[in-house]
Amino acid sequence: MPKKKLIGEVVSDKMDKTVVVAVSTLVKHPRVGKYIKRTKKYYAHDENNECRDGDIVEIIESRPLSKLKRWRVLRIVERSVFADETLDEELEGGSSDDN
């Protein structure tokens, strides 16, 4: 049986080798018939700490890696603009607003 794959947005990268990915889906309300947006969070393993907040990533099902982690980051689909700016600041050695 093939492993499940999901695409979502990284909402937290504060942990070592772990990211929290929010995956949104549309679910039809049984009585009203209106589509409702549902969001679920998944803890995913990020081996090289490459993911940053706001990145769009693809995750794949895996064996249990810890109490909460059952997913691995397969690839980064799209980098966030915010993540690129903070990475540039870190490389420069701080904020450029210092007077």
From Swiss-Prot:
Signal peptide, first to last residue: none
Gene Ontology biological process terms, A to Z: translation
InterPro entries per UniProt: NA-bd_OB-fold (IPR012340), Ribosomal_uS17 (IPR000266), Ribosomal_uS17_bact/chlr (IPR019984), Ribosomal_uS17_CS (IPR019979)
Disulfide-bonded cysteines: none
Transmembrane annotation, as ranges: none
Organism expressing this protein natively: Thermosipho africanus (strain TCF52B)
Protein name (database record): Small ribosomal subunit protein uS17
Gene name of the record: rpsQ
Record-stated family: Belongs to the universal ribosomal protein uS17 family.
Record bears the keyword rRNA-binding: yes
NCBIfam families in the record: PRK05610.1, uS17_bact
Coiled-coil spans in chain: none
UniProt keyword terms in alphabetical order: Ribonucleoprotein, Ribosomal protein, RNA-binding, rRNA-binding
Gene Ontology MF: a single term: rRNA binding
Gene3D superfamilies: Nucleic acid-binding proteins (2.40.50.140)
Record-level GO cellular component terms: cytosolic small ribosomal subunit
Oligomeric form and interacting partners: Part of the 30S ribosomal subunit.
Biological role stated in the UniProt entry: One of the primary rRNA binding proteins, it binds specifically to the 5'-end of 16S ribosomal RNA.
Lineage: Bacteria, Thermotogati, Thermotogota, Thermotogae, Thermotogales
Highest taxon above the source species: Bacteria
